[in-house]
A protein has these predicted regions:
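Short glycine-/small-residue-rich Rossmann-like dinucleotide-binding loops
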Residues: 85-86, 114
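NAD(P)+-binding Rossmann beta1-loop-alpha1 motif at the extreme N-terminus of oxidoreductases
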Residues: 1-48, 102
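Redox-cofactor binding/interface segments in oxidoreductases and associated redox assembly factors
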Residues: 82-83, 111
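Conserved N-terminal Rossmann-fold NAD(P) cofactor-binding segment
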Residues: 28-78, 88-90, 94, 127
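Rossmann-fold NAD(P)-binding glycine/threonine-rich loop
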Residues: 93-138
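Alpha-helix C-terminal capping/helix-to-coil transition sites in glycosyltransferase folds
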Residues: 76-77, 81, 105
Length: 138
């Protein structure tokens, strides 16, 4: 499957860095956080970063922003959904529940966790959902 559209949930240091990396590869990204303002600030940080995170400043146009309450429906069109939220398993499980209700069949779902084992992350997923789930730590 060719990845044409990515949603990154969590716009902190890791989430915004992942979004920038995808932009450099010309992959459209939607960056979601609790509030749109948080995602907008992350987009600004990417644009103004020193050293630059973007190969070409115009690539910033590949990043759309939103929030998980009003804009979560973008998950339906994503080929890859990256979870990059705080390292709290309860929050991650809540996000996965929402993702797996919305995502299209076959869309990849990954966590950017650095410390939580995949067995713990996926303990509430069905066998079918587990086939599309992985850890992608950047």
């Amino acid at each position: 499957m060719k990845i044409k559209n990515v949603v990154v949930i969590g716009s902190g240091t890791m989430g915004s860095g992942i979004a920038a990396h995808l932009c450099n590869a010309n992959v459209p990204v939607t960056l979601l956080d609790l509030k749109t303002e948080i995602s907008e600030k992350a987009r600004e940080r990417i644009h103004k970063s020193r050293p630059p995170l973007l190969i070409d400043k115009s690539k910033i146009n590949n990043i759309k922003v939103g929030n998980i309450s009003d804009n979560f429906d973008v998950v339906k069109d994503a080929d890859w959904i990256v979870e990059a939220v705080v390292e709290r398993i309860d929050i991650k499980h809540q996000i996965y529940e929402k993702i797996f209700k919305e995502r299209k069949d076959g869309a990849i779902v990954s966590s950017n966790t650095s410390s939580i084992p995949i067995k713990v992350l996926s303990e509430h997923l069905t066998d079918k959902e587990k086939k599309d789930f992985c850890i992608t730590h950047f």
